[in-house]
Amino acid sequence: MSSEVTPKVPERPSRRKTSELFPLSGSESGDIEANSEPPTPAGTPNVPTRRPILKAKTMTSFESGMDQESLPKVPLQRPVRRSTTEELNNVMNNTSKELEEIESLISKHNIHNVSRKKSPTSVEEGKVAAIHQNGQRSASDNKTSTNPSPLEKNEHEGAEGNEFAISPSNLVNKSNNEVTEHSDSEDLTEKQKVHAALDNEAGDRSHFEEKLIPGDMKVQVDVSKDVEEGSLNALPPSGITESDDKAEKFTKHPESSLEELQKHQEQQEEKIFQNPTDEESTTSLNEKQEGKDNMEVNSQPQGPSDTETVIAATSSNVPSQIASEEENDVPVIPRSRPKKDFEAHVQKEELPNTQEKRVSEECDSTLISTEEESKIPKIPSERPKRRAPPPVPKKPSSRIAAFQEMLQKQQQQDLHNNGNSSATTASADIAKKHTDSSITSDTTKADFTSKLNGLFALPGMVNPGQLPPSLEKKLSSPDTESKLGPQDQSQAKTGPLGGTRRGRGPRGRKLPSKVASVEKIEEDDNTNKIEIFNNWNVSSSFSKEKVLIDTTPGEQAERALDEKSKSIPEEQREQSPNKMEAALCPFELDEKEKLPANAESDPLSQLPQTNTVGNRKAISEESLSPSEAIANRDQNDTTEIQEQQMEDQMEVDMERELSGGYEDVDSALHSEEASFHSL
């Protein structure tokens, strides 16, 4: 075969050996190194010999492994609850457009742009007003805002353009105020600007506006007019300036300004009544603006050159002076008497009526809306639970029901008896009443006891429905006793003490046959029966003939010798009285008479006599009564005598056997038989 056909045997695969867990000895390690194969490549991972120990999963190891950023942070303070005024703030924000419209109207019809008069004599009035304003400032300490409103700034600027030049100190103050106003205006929100504009208008309103009546601008004009008229009267005729001409123009044409103010008031009333929330916001901020105006006047310098600011303070803060008078109770006397304006008075009287009508209409609308809401049915969230049925009253027991019926019957009977007795007593005569007083007293007692019906335990009471007979006799009248016959009384006495009750058991069921067939035992206590029976009997079957046949002559001779030796005690015994001999039968007496004659001839004739004595005793015991037999038994000593005789006979027989006194064998045998029979 060629080499190509021969198969190639593969090499045997070599086993890889892992490192031992425990170190081997030197010889073993050398053998392993010699036979070891090349080591495995370094790229394969080394399998650890031991399993790594698990770390305890405690809280410390858990916290150390986690990042601090992943854990939630607990807030230091509890979140503050949102205030309840948040809804009101939302309402104010929604009405910002309407407030802007009101602000534009106020800026168009602003009264503060009217030029005011300046005179050196009006400085004193400004000082008086400043004194009252200082007193009012002490009452409102919490209002510390000192920045002037933008409307007042415009007012001062208009006065500067038309009147004399202002001193440099006023310019410095104005520049400072403008800087502060500019910085504050940047911080204010739109809402705060609107409120500031409303505050400026509210600061110039009178006490009538505080009562929710808008359009008080006319009152301010009247007050300022009175003040200017007083100042004109105080001026000298020579010192007339341009400001005086302007003031005269203002006083000469008051009607045109009044018409414009009335129109403005009507427009403002309509808007405010349409949005009452805006009016409330303006009235609430009225007091704040008054405090700001007071601070402005005090912050400005008071001197002969600053007469313009003093006049503005007196004209704008007349309501504040009235309030300060009410607080401090210090009256202020004006220099000129105010003139009465009939048109303003009429308008003031008409305004409250219109306001009351509108307020009443609003109240009616609110009431109608609440009534409509109340009429609308509301679906409850949860279904109402059904009420449980009323508890059924328990039925009274039979005893309670019977007791209630009994009481009702008694009450009805008592009512009938009382009605009948009242009719009879009215018809009875007075004489009969005196005679029958004792009888009626007895009947009333009986009625009283019958009403009790055993409710109270009386002595001797057995049945609650009946009274004892002794008590009935005492309480019953003599007429009732006479009416009752002897038979009725006997029946009443022999009545049952208590009602028989039926035994409790299964109703409507028959008893088992074993129980039903049992006869009842009836005990009769009145009958007595006597029975006589014999307790014991004595019978003797030993006869005289039988003894004679059994005994031999040799035995008879031996017995005779024994009896002779014992003759002395027998004679004594015969001499002692014996009661048993008197009870012997007559045939035994005949035998006893015959025996003594034969006894002398035959000495063995005494044995039958002993037997006859036993027979006599048996006969006598049968004839005697039990008590007599017991007495004779105690006195009889026959049993003891017989025992003594037997013992003596046995001793004699023993002596004969030991001595060998028998002559023949026959005599010895006969003696043994005799001893056996004697036993």
From Swiss-Prot:
One Gene Ontology cellular component annotation held by this UniProt entry: actin cortical patch
Highest taxon in the source lineage: Eukaryota
Bias kind Basic residues: ranges: 501-512
Keywords: Cytoplasm, Cytoskeleton, Phosphoprotein
Location of Phosphothreonine modifications: T18, T58, T85, T277, T552
Chain segments carrying region Interaction with SH3 domain of ABP1: 383-396
Compositionally biased tracts (Basic and acidic residues): 9-19, 179-213, 243-272, 339-361, 372-383, 471-482, 556-576, 667-679
Keyword Phosphoprotein included in the entry's annotation: yes
Keyword Thylakoid among UniProt keywords: no
Composition bias, Polar residues: 133-149, 167-178, 296-323, 414-427, 437-452, 603-614
InterPro entries: Aim21
Family, similarity comment: Belongs to the AIM21 family.
Self-association state and partner proteins as the record states: Interacts with ribosomes. Interacts with ABP1.
Protein name: Altered inheritance of mitochondria protein 21
Source organism (scientific name): Saccharomyces cerevisiae (strain JAY291) (Baker's yeast)
Gene: AIM21
